[in-house]
Amino acid sequence: MGKEKLILAYSGGLDTSVAIAWLKKDYDVIAVCMDVGEGKDLDFIHDKALTIGAIESYILDVKDEFAEHFVLPALQAHAMYEQKYPLVSALSRPIIAQKLVEMAHQTGATTIAHGCTGKGNDQVRFEVAIAALDPELKVIAPVREWKWHREEEITFAKANGVPIPADLDNPYSIDQNLWGRANECGVLENPWNQAPEEAFGITKSPEEAPDCAEYIDITFQNGKPIAINNQEMTLADLILSLNEIAGKHGIGRIDHVENRLVGIKSREIYECPAAMVLLAAHKEIEDLTLVREVSHFKPILENELSNLIYNALWFSPATKAIIAYVKETQKVVNGTTKVKLYKGSAKVVARHSSNSLYDENLATYTAADNFDQDAAVGFIKLWGLPTQVNAQVNKG
């Protein structure tokens, strides 16, 4: 009788490479790596998995699906965990889990493995998502089970013919996709240490950014960014392009001490140039086009959605319901913003929309004013009536 098939979420790094060598004793390991826009050498990763002992190796290009079905709903909901973090890693985990489950069904695998440690958020995100999509699949986490130190991993790797990554002495733990880059560990673990320039990878230091501002126009259709400077492109390509444009101006650097799902605080350095520009630009079009009641209510749901996504509940009914509400609000979110990029700042300086609720003739203080000021007297009386009655009854 043959071995059980196992799907391994494979990154090409030391942890998941050692996992192949360890798991192949009991399983037929199928390595699956998702391209979510991190810019890795995917051919090398594909071949490396086979060299170590995987029976099959797959590279899945999911950039467009990731952008359209995961990043876009988060953008439209202005999803920012603790008002600072655009959920870079948290957004990629659900699609990775989804593809792992699909590959398990396709290959007949009964088990999924991931390379997460026992103290991070991602173990929860993967396992909760997999359980939501197929509760019959088994999940194992070799790195969590081993509790090995890095030196023990290296010893095992050398003894089992696992190639040692060239950048093994890099003190940082980095995760990247098209929505941004996350960095932790090393000197960053002390929150009193200023992040050194070497900790950043996709943004220039604001001090070293160009001395001249750059202006770009971003066009939205139904809440979706579709063009930069009138050049239409897919959402994934637009985000990747904007990462380069805004990154060279030092935009999107975030230094965040965050509350992890597992109960500890961690210090993270994020680089999210495209995300920060698009979030600002999208909000300005909403300010023009959404009625007051929606503008005031939507942020309540946005905060809740941010927490749900961060806390591993992308596939929950609550997430689905909030995304449906947000999508309904986006039907009128059409227009263009002009954004000034300069030394770490992305500032919207102009905006227009065919659905704009801004009426200059109502807002102006010039002779063109057509606001009926006489109506204000009755409005004020009725609006303040409950307060007036309370003051009369309760003597203020």
From Swiss-Prot:
Main enzyme class: ligase
GO cellular component: cytoplasm
Predominant cellular place of this UniProt entry's protein: cytoplasm
Pathway(s) per entry: Amino-acid biosynthesis; L-arginine biosynthesis; L-arginine from L-ornithine and carbamoyl phosphate: step 2/3
The protein's name: Argininosuccinate synthase
Similarity field: Belongs to the argininosuccinate synthase family. Type 1 subfamily.
Keyword entries, A-Z: Amino-acid biosynthesis, Arginine biosynthesis, ATP-binding, Cytoplasm, Ligase, Nucleotide-binding
Subcellular location: Cytoplasm
One annotated GO molecular function: argininosuccinate synthase activity
PROSITE patterns named in the record: ARGININOSUCCIN_SYN_1, ARGININOSUCCIN_SYN_2
EC number: 6.3.4.5
GO BP term (any one): urea cycle
Binding site for L-citrulline: 85, 121, 125, 173, 258, 270
InterPro entries: Arginosuc_syn_C, Arginosuc_syn_N, Arginosuc_synth, Arginosuc_synth_CS, Arginosuc_synth_type_1_subfam, AS_cat/multimer_dom_body, Rossmann-like_a/b/a_fold
NCBIfam families recorded: argG, PRK00509.1
Residues annotated for ATP binding in this entry: 9-17, 115
Binding positions (L-aspartate): 117, 121-122
Gene: argG
Subunit structure comment from the entry: Homotetramer.
Reactions that this protein is recorded to catalyse: L-citrulline + L-aspartate + ATP = 2-(N(omega)-L-arginino)succinate + AMP + diphosphate + H(+)
